[in-house]
Amino acid sequence: MNIRSFLLISIFTAISYLVVDGATPRTFAPSASVSINYGTLSTVFPSLYRRASTSSSSSSSSISTSHDSQPSTSSSSPSSTSTSSSSGTSVITASDVSASNEIISSSTNNSIHQQVSVVTEYVTIQPTTYVTTIFQYTSLASTIAAQSGIASLVPQTYTPYGGVKALIGILVGVVVGSVFLLAIVMVIARIWGPRLLANKDQNNNNEDLDSNLVSKDSEGTPQITYASNF
């Protein structure tokens, strides 16, 4: 292997590393270009898509009952009910006076406290089905855990084409592949070419030697002619 072939292979390796390393899945910023059309995620290169979901609910209730006995002064039984509500809290209070003037009051307090918890998921969208196999990716998009501690695989729907970078990548792949094939042919020709030429020259020399020997043998043989008289 000469210096030229070594340089060609080194250049090809470097270009291939840059191309493939630029195409491998990695963590991008949340501002990566991901277009959403009718609920379908579309991207050309691996992109990071951020989605957030909120969920919370908590409630508390309390019931209290009090009894107060008073001397009997009247036989009437009045009753009263009051209701008040403000900022998500409802308080219902009811009181009743029994025949024995024993005041029975009960109150119910229902309070709803909203506790909002935000879970942020980063979904890596990866394209697939490129023309050349150099740019083959996986067909699943992995959900990267942010602070939720959850990691799973979420299949997504996307389109693999639609950008100038993809076409440039395909052209670079074709050029790099052609250079690689040319380097292989040059190395094979450099190594095996002289041997093949030497074998061919040796075969030609052997054929010439055989033909010379046959001609010399025929020169020493007397020629016999037949004559007849009619």
Curated annotation (Swiss-Prot):
<feature type="region of interest" description="Disordered">
    <location>
        <begin position="208"/>
        <end position="230"/>
    </location>
</feature>
<keyword id="KW-0732">Signal</keyword>
<keyword id="KW-0256">Endoplasmic reticulum</keyword>
<dbReference type="GO" id="GO:0005783">
    <property type="term" value="C:endoplasmic reticulum"/>
</dbReference>
<keyword id="KW-0472">Membrane</keyword>
<feature type="transmembrane region" description="Helical">
    <location>
        <begin position="168"/>
        <end position="188"/>
    </location>
</feature>
<feature type="region of interest" description="Disordered">
    <location>
        <begin position="55"/>
        <end position="90"/>
    </location>
</feature>
<feature type="topological domain" description="Lumenal">
    <location>
        <begin position="23"/>
        <end position="167"/>
    </location>
</feature>
<keyword id="KW-0812">Transmembrane</keyword>
<feature type="signal peptide">
    <location>
        <begin position="1"/>
        <end position="22"/>
    </location>
</feature>
<feature type="topological domain" description="Cytoplasmic">
    <location>
        <begin position="189"/>
        <end position="230"/>
    </location>
</feature>
<protein>
    <recommendedName>
        <fullName>Uncharacterized protein C16G5.06</fullName>
    </recommendedName>
</protein>
<keyword id="KW-1133">Transmembrane helix</keyword>
<dbReference type="GO" id="GO:0005789">
    <property type="term" value="C:endoplasmic reticulum membrane"/>
</dbReference>
